[in-house]
């Protein structure tokens, strides 16, 4: 059986996670949140007081790490050493350090094999920053989501508020997003690359973006 793979890339706060989850739910696909995997690795490093990119220490931590991704009723769970950390990784501190550790060749190699294997056993939609260019270069559908820095910062602040985190400064979040954009676009390993099927979500509702993506996937399914 031929499974359909959908790669969705985009910068921080572009709506990737929210939108791809909705698309996956409507189509019955598995939603693979690669960002959660990098966050989980980062969460583990921070819990072990690793806050700098030291490749030797990174490799040492990874060598003893038990990492697993499971799907239950189409929902993804990320486990570190047997513990479900899916909710614990959604903090401002983890967000701040995730882009740093994503630069690590060891971290990327550790996760990419896992991500590719997930695409072999089901219809999947996967989001991240280098899915179309590196992880799934032969994906059936490739999409790039973006939005203005101001809109992405606004969305990120709302996300924190929904989690009960109310002491978040909008201007600080905006500057962090700008810095992360620069890091993602200029890193030596797998920089963020805009593919042809780009959708600017700044002025679109979530439902409008979801429908645009579903149209692209349905077209591919019917070929």
Residue ranges: model-predicted function:
Residues 70, 115-122, 129-134, 138, ...:
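Small-molecule kinase domains that catalyze NTP-dependent phosphoryl transfer to phosphate-bearing small molecules
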Residues 17:
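Walker A/P-loop
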Residues 11-14:
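ATP-binding Walker
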Residues 86-98, 102-162:
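ATP-dependent NMP and nucleoside kinases share a basic, alpha-helical "lid"
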Residues 6-8:
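Hydrophobic anchor at the beta1->P-loop junction of P-loop NTPases
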Residues 142-145, 149-151, 156-160, 191, ...:
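Glycine-rich phosphate-binding loops of nucleotide-dependent enzymes
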Residues 26-90:
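N-terminal phosphate/diphosphate-binding loop that engages ATP/GTP or pyrophosphate donors
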